[in-house]
A protein has these predicted regions:
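Surface-exposed amphipathic alpha-helical segments
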Residues: 139-188
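Secretory pathway targeting signatures of secreted, lumenal, and periplasmic proteins
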Residues: 32-72
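Positively charged n-region of N-terminal signal peptides that target proteins for export
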Residues: 1-5
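Bacterial N-terminal signal peptides
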Residues: 8-16
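A short, surface-exposed beta-strand/turn
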Residues: 124-138, 144-145
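Signature of long, low-cysteine stretches enriched in small and polar/charged residues
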Residues: 89-130
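Mid-chain, structured segments of secreted extracytoplasmic proteins
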Residues: 62-104
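Bacterial Sec-dependent signal peptides at the C-terminal "C-region" and cleavage site
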Residues: 17-24
Length: 188
């Protein structure tokens, strides 16, 4: 097939994503709007929201929602949390906190904080994860932060954790994610 014949298909697919992404309301986190930047359904449907002027390949903060239809009960949620921990550890993450908590209504959720040391980029990536049961099944809400400092990024990341981790945890606890069935999905 000639390139000139494939270009319209690529253009069409790109415009379909832009149309779907543009119809999704931004997710607000700490009063800052995050717009849908990517979504896929590889293993589980996942939507990544970026702050203004950032992309999924070049971000300093990222808000991600993952649909987990495989978890529908509290024991399923515990297994999901263990799987999250195992996956992060397998990718070199250092688990800084893993705890079952209760929201203001008394509903339990799992809260996990994981750090990734990225010395080549002189940064520490921190993932704050809430795994909870929604109306139909579990979901994960992940707030990612990349802390960078050319002189001492590790010290800056520690200071960030000391100063901000409590408020990030509270913001995640109270965060209402969009109804997952309203978010775009790719048809295969």
């Amino acid at each position: 097939m000639k390139t000139s014949q494939t270009l319209p298909i690529c253009t069409l697919l790109g415009s379909l994503f832009l149309t779907a992404a543009s119809t999704v309301e931004p997710v607000n986190f700490f009063g800052r709007p995050y717009r849908l930047a990517s979504y896929n359904q590889k293993a589980n449907a996942m939507w990544e929201f970026t702050a203004p002027n950032e992309t999924v390949t070049n971000w300093t903060t990222l808000f991600t929602i993952v649909d987990r239809p495989d978890a529908r009960t509290p024991p399923d949620l515990d297994r999901l949390a263990q799987g999250i921990l195992d996956a992060y550890k397998a990718k070199g993450g250092k688990v800084l906190l893993a705890k079952t908590m209760k929201d203001s209504t008394g509903k339990p959720y799992n809260y996990i904080v994981v750090g990734f040391d990225q010395p080549a980029q002189k940064r520490f990536e921190l993932n704050f994860v809430k795994a909870a049961l929604g109306p139909k099944n579990a979901y994960m809400a992940i707030y990612g932060v990349r802390v960078t400092d050319p002189k001492d990024y590790v010290a800056k990341a520690k200071a960030f954790l000391n100063e901000r981790s409590t408020e990030i945890g509270k913001e995640l606890e109270n965060k209402k994610v969009p109804a997952l069935e309203t978010l775009p999905r790719r048809e295969f």
